Amino acid sequence: MKVLMRKCGKCGRYTLKERCPVCGERTHMPIPPRFSIEDPYGKYRRKLRKEIGFFSFRR
């Protein structure tokens, strides 16, 4: 069985449990999402960047 490390967002400690044993907050997995070459949300991200002017410095 594969068990992944989890991190407490409040105190920053690592654990294997759903709740932090020190402060009792919920933990999350600090691993990044999987990379996909198809990028199903790419068009939405590009649209948002265009709307907020993220690429305004480029010509």
Swiss-Prot record:
Any one cellular-component term (Gene Ontology): ribonucleoprotein complex
Biological process according to GO: pseudouridine synthesis; rRNA processing
Alphabetical keyword list: Ribonucleoprotein, Ribosome biogenesis, rRNA processing
Cited SUPFAM superfamilies: Nop10-like SnoRNP
UniProt keyword Transferase present: no
Positions of transmembrane segments: none
Gene Ontology molecular function: snoRNA binding
Known role: Involved in ribosome biogenesis; more specifically in 18S rRNA pseudouridylation and in cleavage of pre-rRNA.
PANTHER family: H_ACA RIBONUCLEOPROTEIN COMPLEX SUBUNIT 3 (PTHR13305:SF0), RIBOSOME BIOGENESIS PROTEIN NOP10 (PTHR13305)
Cross-referenced HAMAP family: Nop10 (MF_00803)
Family indicated by similarity: Belongs to the NOP10 family.
Name this protein carries in UniProt: Ribosome biogenesis protein Nop10
Organism name: Archaeoglobus fulgidus (strain ATCC 49558 / DSM 4304 / JCM 9628 / NBRC 100126 / VC-16)
